[in-house]
Amino acid sequence: MDQPEDTDALVRFENITYSYPYSDSRVLSDVNLKLEKGEFVLLAGPSGCGKSTLVRCFNRLVPEISGGKLSGRVIIRGKDLREEKVHKLALEVGMVFQNPETQLFSLKVEDDLAFGPENLGLPGKEILSRVEKSLKAIKLEKLKDHFIFTLSGGEKQRTAIGGNLAMEPEILVLDEPTSDLDPSGTREVLDLLRRLNAEKRITLILIEHKLDEVFELADRMLVMDEGKVILDGKPFDILCREEGKLKKLGIHPPQIIEISRLLGFNCRTSSPPYENILKRLAELLMPSTRELQPESRKEAKPKIPPALCPEESLSHVRIEKLSCRREDGSETLKNVNLDIKYGEFLALLGHNGAGKTTLAGHLMRFHKPSSGRILLNGKNISKYSTAQLSQQIGYLFQNPDSQIFMNSVFEEVRFGLKNLKIPEEEMKKRVNSALEMMELSVYRNRHPQALSRGQRQRLAVASILALEPDLLVLDEPTTGQDRGHIHKFLDKIRELNRLGKTVILISHDMELVAEYAERVIVMKQGEVLLDGPAAEVFLSPEELDAAGLIPPLPARLALDLRKQGFDVPGMLTVSELKSFLRAHNVEIRD
Ligand SMILES: Nc1ncnc2c1ncn2[C@@H]1O[C@H](COP(=O)(O)OP(=O)(O)OP(=O)(O)O)[C@@H](O)[C@H]1O
Ligand SMILES: Nc1ncnc2c1ncn2[C@@H]1O[C@H](COP(=O)(O)OP(=O)(O)OP(=O)(O)O)[C@@H](O)[C@H]1O
């Protein structure tokens, strides 16, 4: 980095074109970009469009580590990165990867946060101060001397963010940093990013599928498709003006934009504040007001598909007085009692570290309870091995890489079926249909590690669907996916549920839970805090708040309207809000 070039831009991408090794197809195609110092850039696009590949050019992980062929130049502060070394750039350009496990390599949380500053050669006092500040920012002070391998998914993600914050880089690239965080953790991290950007003028490049949370924070939005930047502008403008194009790419507008448009707001630069939306709704409902006709109320109720299983009332899973004490003495499950019927679609929610994965893991006997028992189809599972249980339970791990180990996409899906000793023809049929369902047929011969994160997640799901188990346990299956793929996948899961399969979905995505789950269980610090129909649970704001959860926007509006005396049902989705308004002859813009 000797001869600075004459330019104001902090980062310039000039005609960047890239192909991975052994592949002729261009993953990045003639990308030209300029980023100014202090910009907060949101990068969006469908799964597999090249977002992660693009951001890895910022510190030359592409092509130095990935291999492959890169043409064009990346210039940071006037200096051509082709003359730079990856390890040096890593100190200037912070990067929070999609999978936190790939960047946590110390034994304990605080050691991991100190690693970067130590490499910068900072004095001991400064290192300590930075570690303290980062711990506070990521709210992990209490876990500072915990071993990394004992952390929950979200706690690991916070640690990975903290490690980067401690380096105080000029440019920080974050590849879906909130994908495993609970809603209040997501808000905290995004708020922290906003502060870093505003106060320290750190340039931020954020890949994020949760647009509701970020579109008002970022100055600029880039949308990619098939290796190209196809839209570049103010997030609000793009989301409002390019809705058709975005929807085709599987990018859905945030609920607040959808609802404000329905209600006739004519916004130019930002969405109206929540209070204005509530006020407009109250005004619109006033004429038909507070006494609802029984018929219309019936129509507005959430449409929950009845499970078709004839044995509906029988317990598929019964969890009795289950407690789990870890080796370090901490109690991660406390007297959990649950009765899950055949054909239920339930969601398991809770703050990071609440015990969701630990509870789900007990179903597979990954952990042994310290007391209590679990009955599956009426039988105590303590008699079964994990291998036997996996023939009845399709279990999707939080991190897809924990369950992918074959050399090709096809073989990966086939692997589980081989263990079931199914005839070859039937096996092929099931593999092909699972790959097609997850839109992975074109990658059938590819090595799974040469897929994007979202594609690997879909591969893990395909492997489980091919087994056709009666009980599906899905631990955050939608991480890293665009809305289009998420809906296709969850529609399929709902179809299976209607055929009688029982579904347990662990998720931090309240909008999806509101749309798909019939029953919602909220956990807090190892205990069940709430358990009931989705509409009821989402209308319990105090308890949800205590568990770090934020109800979806339509549910919040319904609740506040009730407080004002309106007789409204527990609406959970934008389409329920629409039908409710129509039933009251309220004119809406669709
Ligand atoms: N090592 C590799 N070899 C060949 N192709 C690869 C490799 N890694 C990724 N790809 C392909 O490059 C394309 C872009 O991948 P990338 O990870 O950049 O996508 P993405 O937009 O970040 O996706 P996601 O949102 O799912 O993380 C994908 O089609 C993927 O299959
Ligand atoms: N091996 C272990 N030893 C000690 N504590 C552990 C161990 N594994 C997990 N824990 C702790 O148990 C608690 C529950 O973890 P779990 O993974 O079940 O949470 P979770 O609700 O699934 O969280 P997330 O939403 O972050 O994935 C966490 O605080 C975690 O730190």
UniProtKB/Swiss-Prot annotation:
Say yes or no: keyword rRNA-binding present: no
Which EC numbers does the record give?
A: 7.-.-.-
NCBIfam families cross-referenced by the UniProt entry: PRK13648.1
UniProt function note: Probably part of an ABC transporter complex. Responsible for energy coupling to the transport system.
Chief location of this protein within or outside the cell: membrane
Molecular function (GO) terms for this protein are:
ATP binding; ATP hydrolysis activity; ATPase-coupled transmembrane transporter activity
Membrane topology type: Peripheral membrane protein
Q: Which Pfam families match?
A: ABC_tran (PF00005)
GO annotations of cellular component type: ATP-binding cassette (ABC) transporter complex
UniProt keywords (A-Z) are: ATP-binding, Cell membrane, Membrane, Nucleotide-binding, Repeat, Translocase, Transport
Record localization: Cell membrane
Keyword Translocase in the entry? The reply is: yes
Quick one: which residues bind ATP 2? G350, H351, N352, G353, A354, G355, K356, T357
- Span of domain ABC transporter: 11-251, 317-550
Q: CDD domains annotated for this entry?
A: ABC_cobalt_CbiO_domain1
**Which residues are noted in the entry as ATP 1-binding?**
G45, P46, S47, G48, C49, G50, K51, S52
> What organism is this sequence from?
Methanosarcina mazei (strain ATCC BAA-159 / DSM 3647 / Goe1 / Go1 / JCM 11833 / OCM 88) (Methanosarcina frisia)
Q: What is this protein called?
A: Putative ABC transporter ATP-binding protein MM_3016
- Family that this chain belongs to: Belongs to the ABC transporter superfamily.
